[in-house]
From Swiss-Prot:
Biological process, per Gene Ontology: defense response to virus
Disruption phenotype annotation: Mutants lose phage DMS3 infection-dependent inhibition of biofilm formation while there is normal biofilm formation in the absence of phage infection. Loss of production of crRNA in the presence or absence of phage. Disruption of the entire Y.pestis-subtype CRISPR region disrupts crRNA production but does not alter phage resistance (possibly OLNs PA14_33350 to PA14_33310, and the flanking CRISPR loci), indicating this CRISPR is not involved in phage resistance.
Additional remark text: In this bacteria, Y.pestis-subtype CRISPRs do not confer resistance to phage DMS3 or MP22, but instead are required for DMS3 infection-dependent inhibition of biofilm formation and possibly motility.
Described function: CRISPR (clustered regularly interspaced short palindromic repeat) is an adaptive immune system that provides protection against mobile genetic elements (viruses, transposable elements and conjugative plasmids). CRISPR clusters contain sequences complementary to antecedent mobile elements and target invading nucleic acids. CRISPR clusters are transcribed and processed into CRISPR RNA (crRNA). Cas3 and Cascade participate in CRISPR interference, the third stage of CRISPR immunity (Potential). Absolutely required for crRNA production or stability.
Superkingdom of the source species: Bacteria
Keyword field: Antiviral defense
Family: Belongs to the CRISPR-associated Csy2 family.
Subunit structure, interactors included: Interacts directly with Csy1; part of the Csy ribonucleoprotein complex with a probable stoichiometry of Csy1(1),Csy2(1),Csy3(6),Cas6/Csy4(1)-crRNA(1). A Csy3(6),Cas6/Csy4(1)-crRNA(1) subcomplex is also formed.
Protein name, as recorded: CRISPR-associated protein Csy2
CDD domains, alphabetized: Csy2_I-F (cd09736)
Organism: Pseudomonas aeruginosa (strain UCBPP-PA14)
Length: 327
C-alpha cells in the first residue's frame, strides 16, 4: 500500500467526546473503530479543503482518557451497558429500550496535511479554521464538547511543517510529542499477527489467523518451565500468565464484500440513491496501544483508508508503522 507523504502535521489536541459509539463491530466493544476517525477526517476535509486549498489525509489516534458507560449489576460477574430511559409514548406506555454502547473519551488527533494552501495561508490560520470546523462535527457518533476546564486555557491546534533540516525536524517532533503525553497511540500490527500465526503453526498446523488473533489478545495461563531435578520431584502446581509483546487488542480492520457492487438506485429502500451500494462484513486485525514517544516519526502513527473494489476489500491500517514497526 502506497500513501502520499504529508507535508505537514496538524494537531487537534484534547478533544472531549461524549457518548461515542462503544460497539465497534459484532465481536468487539470498547474504543471506537479506527474507521470512525478516518471517516471523521474525510468529512472534515470536505468542509475545509476547498476554502483552504489543502488536503487532509491520514489520522493519528492518541487516547488520553476512556470511560465506558457500563455498570456491574449486584450479584453478577458480567458488566452491562448503561442504557437510556426514553420518554413515554403518547398513550402513556413505556417506550422501548434500544440497546446501545456508549463511552466518553478524550483524544488528540494528528492529521496529515498537504496542498498548495500551506504556502498561501498562515499556519495559525489553517490550524484555527480546522479546529473550529472540527468542534462543530460529531466523532464516532459522539458530540465534541467545548473546553470546560477553568484552571487551564483551552489548548490550540498546531500546524507543524515537516520541512527543514533533520535537527529542526527532530526538535519539532519532540515538542509535538510532549503535547500527546500522557496518552497511548493506536497502531496496526498486521506483521506481528502474521509472525505469530507462523509460530503457532509449528505446533498446530491447522491454526488459522483467527486462532493467532485470539491467542495474542486473550490472557493465557501456562505452567512455568521446570528443570530436570524439579521434574523428578514435582513441586506444587504453579501457573503464570504468558507475557505479551505489547498492549495488544483486537480491532476492526475494514470490510469484505458479500455482494457485487450495485448501481445507484438498484437496491430498493437504500438510504442513498445516488451512491453505489454493496453489502459487506467486518474484517478483524491486531492493534497495539503504545506511547507516542516510541515511534521514530509521528507520521508513522497515521491511519489511512485503502480500497480495492475489484477484490471487495475496504481496509484501514498504519502502513508507515508497519514498515518501521518496533520489535
Amino acid at each position: 500500500m502506497s500513501v502520499t507523504d504529508p507535508e505537514a502535521l496538524l494537531l487537534l489536541p484534547r478533544l472531549s467526546i461524549q457518548n461515542a459509539n462503544a460497539i465497534s463491530s459484532p465481536l468487539t466493544w470498547g474504543f471506537p473503530s479506527p474507521g470512525a476517525f478516518t471517516g471523521f477526517v474525510h468529512a472534515l476535509q470536505r468542509r475545509v479543503g476547498i476554502s483552504l486549498d489543502i488536503e487532509l489525509d491520514g489520522v493519528g489516534i492518541v487516547c488520553h482518557r476512556f470511560e465506558a458507560q457500563i455498570s456491574q449489576p449486584a450479584g453478577k460477574r458480567t458488566k452491562v451497558f448503561n442504557l437510556t430511559r426514553n420518554p413515554l409514548n403518547r398513550d402513556g406506555s413505556t417506550a422501548a429500550i434500544v440497546e446501545e454502547g456508549r463511552a466518553h473519551l478524550e483524544v488528540s488527533l494528528l492529521l496529515g496535511v498537504h496542498g498548495d494552501g500551506l504556502d498561501d495561508h498562515p499556519a495559525q490560520e489553517i490550524a484555527r479554521q480546522v479546529q473550529e470546523q472540527a468542534g462543530a462535527m460529531r466523532l464516532a457518533g459522539g458530540s465534541i464538547l467545548p473546553w470546560c476546564n477553568e484552571r487551564f486555557p483551552a489548548p490550540n491546534a498546531e500546524l507543524l511543517m515537516l520541512g527543514g533540516s533533520d535537527e529542526q525536524r527532530r526538535k519539532n517532533q519532540r515538542r509535538l510529542t510532549r503535547r500527546l503525553l500522557p496518552g497511548f497511540a493506536l497502531v496496526s500490527r498486521e506483521a506481528l499477527l502474521q509472525q505469530h500465526l507462523e509460530t503457532l503453526r509449528t505446533t498446530l498446523p491447522e491454526a488459522t489467523t483467527l486462532d493467532a488473533l485470539l491467542d495474542l489478545c486473550r490472557i493465557n495461563f501456562e505452567p512455568p518451565a521446570t528443570s530436570s531435578e524439579e521434574e523428578a520431584s514435582p513441586p506444587d502446581a504453579a501457573w503464570q500468565v504468558r507475557d505479551k509483546p505489547g498492549w495488544l487488542v483486537p480491532i476492526p480492520a475494514g470490510y469484505n464484500a458479500l455482494s457485487p457492487l450495485y448501481l445507484p438506485g438498484e437496491v430498493r429502500n437504500a438510504r442513498d440513491r445516488e451512491t453505489p451500494l454493496r453489502f459487506v462484513e467486518n474484517l478483524f486485525g491486531l492493534g497495539e496501544w503504545l506511547s507516542p514517544h516510541r515511534v521514530a516519526a509521528l507520521s508513522d502513527l497515521l491511519w489511512y483508508h485503502h480500497a480495492e473494489p475489484d477484490k471487495g476489500l475496504y481496509r484501514w491500517s498504519t502502513p508507515r508503522f508497519v514498515e518501521h514497526a518496533i520489535a
